[in-house]
């Protein structure tokens, strides 16, 4: 499958905007949660970088596969992104904390992070999807 320049630009824009959005949302959340400490704003760039890697590994290949059916703001695509996001967050949690891997399902942050990450990527993918 060959990618033309327009499609490649769309993938890159989706990846960049999703990573920056994710970093901004969770970085600002940590800024407020830390009591408005200015140093917490550095986390925006750190979170955006980690989001870029995660989106590149998990969401970008899925995006290429889902783009075979070109539908903007498809609820089915959103649910697929959510399922992959749950799997990705679980995988990273399992690698970091193997003995406590199942405790993450009791964590509210697990669900929020997964759903927000999926929503952000799905939203930007739908915005940059061109017919």
From Swiss-Prot:
Q: Where in the cell is it found?
A: Cell membrane
One GO term of the cellular component aspect?
A: plasma membrane
Pfam families, A to Z: UPF0715
Q: Which domain of life is it from?
A: Bacteria
Membrane-spanning intervals of the chain? 12-32, 38-58, 75-95, 108-128
The way this protein sits in the membrane is described as:
Multi-pass membrane protein
Q: Which InterPro entries match?
A: UPF0715 (IPR031374)
- Entry annotated with the keyword Membrane: yes
Give the similarity note: Belongs to the UPF0715 family.
By what name is this protein known?
SPbeta prophage-derived UPF0715 membrane protein YopD
């Amino acid at each position: 499958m060959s990618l033309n320049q327009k499609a490649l630009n769309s993938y890159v824009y989706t990846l960049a905007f999703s990573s920056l959005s994710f970093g901004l949302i969770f970085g600002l959340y940590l800024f407020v949660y830390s009591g408005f400490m200015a140093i917490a704003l550095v986390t925006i760039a750190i979170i955006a970088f980690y989001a870029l890697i995660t989106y590149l590994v998990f969401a970008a290949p899925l995006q290429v596969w889902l783009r075979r059916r070109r539908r903007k703001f498809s609820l089915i695509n959103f649910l697929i992104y959510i399922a992959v996001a749950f799997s990705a967050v679980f995988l990273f949690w399992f690698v970091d904390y193997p003995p406590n891997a199942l405790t993450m399902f009791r964590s509210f942050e697990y669900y929020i992070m997964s759903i927000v990450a999926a929503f952000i990527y799905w939203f930007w993918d739908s915005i940059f999807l061109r017919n």
